[in-house]
């Protein structure tokens, strides 16, 4: 379901895929070729949520903010199943593993990988191209070329799947 909040209307690129049973409300911007998967909730009723190009937000994720603290996802970000993102910044090509939580004013560096089930506390900065894991998340190591290749594959596959599902939606209309 997509609807405004007060005077703010979601802005969704025509090429983006929005799965059924997804809720998007308020001051939300979703970029080209992004995909928002089943049962996810993106609320822009407190501050803006800005989602770049080729971002995938997987099933059952929740994106929200605190007053005056936007939520920003740069291009080609992967957000795993059941992730909570709250007023944080996720830099380009980062991957947030399934079931992770990233809290207010945390920043995930470009190309960083947050391991499944991690908690990134308020204000924590994760450096670019590192693997961070745990509750609270701690940097474990630098990413290997194989890690980076795998992250790129996941992002690419979700972009392709999103376009496939979008074509199915068009056929149903």
Where are the language model's segments positioned?
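Terminal amphipathic alpha-helical/low-complexity segments used for targeting or macromolecular assembly
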Residues: 1-15, 124-130, 135-173
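Structural signal for interior beta-strand "rungs" in well-ordered beta-sheet cores
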Residues: 4-127, 131-132, 137-139
